[in-house]
From Swiss-Prot:
Residues with glycosylation annotation: R32
One function term, GO molecular function aspect: translation elongation factor activity
Listed NCBIfam families: efp, PRK00529.1
GO biological process: peptide biosynthetic process
Main location per the UniProt record: cytoplasm
Source species: Pseudomonas putida (strain ATCC 47054 / DSM 6125 / CFBP 8728 / NCIMB 11950 / KT2440)
Name of the protein: Elongation factor P
Subcellular location: Cytoplasm
Keywords: Cytoplasm, Elongation factor, Glycoprotein, Protein biosynthesis
Family: Belongs to the elongation factor P family.
A Pfam family that the UniProt record links to this protein: Elong-fact-P_C
Organism taxonomic ancestry: Bacteria, Pseudomonadati, Pseudomonadota, Gammaproteobacteria, Pseudomonadales
Function as written in the Swiss-Prot or TrEMBL entry: Involved in peptide bond synthesis. Stimulates efficient translation and peptide-bond synthesis on native or reconstituted 70S ribosomes in vitro. Probably functions indirectly by altering the affinity of the ribosome for aminoacyl-tRNA, thus increasing their reactivity as acceptors for peptidyl transferase.
Processing and modification events after translation: Glycosylated ar Arg-32 by EarP: arginine rhamnosylation is required for EF-P function and rescue of polyproline stalled ribosomes.
Amino acid sequence: MKTGKELKPGTVLRIDNDPWLVQKAEFTKSGRNSAIMKTKLKNLLTGYKTETVYGADDKLDDVILDRKEATLSFINGDEYTFMDTTDYTMYELNAEDIEAVLPYIEEGMEDVCEAVFFEGRLVSVELPTTISRKVVYTENAARGDTSGKVMKPAKLANGTEISVADFIQIDEWIDIDTRDNSFKGRSKK
């Protein structure tokens, strides 16, 4: 059993005996009302999508999933093909199925992912919590602006934008926390 506040993208719930994948989860807490979790869910059997709100303390039936290590093999349009690192089996997913990790996926990436299976079927892919990516564009630092933690926008090779520290330059490798899309520092790559 999981509570509403424990939901995150990639979690699979059993609702009316169907497996539902949490594609997006946003925790909201206001001063007056109790905390809630706004979620976007996708039925893994029918593909139907819905938005649902759960209370932070609501009890939900989660599903035990099989997990295997996999790497991105290639991208063909909206189809992403992953390969099992132990037996070299190929699995395909649509862009919709991996919407949560799509900003970090790029051709030629070397990160080992975790392929998530429900009853023998690949349902999603989870990335490591920290990944390294190359900055392809960023503005120069503003002179004299050194008060506090100064951030600026940067663009990665796949077009994703992220806020980075002021000292990061073009062609530098950075570490990114995939849980909250935050800049962690320069990569040792």
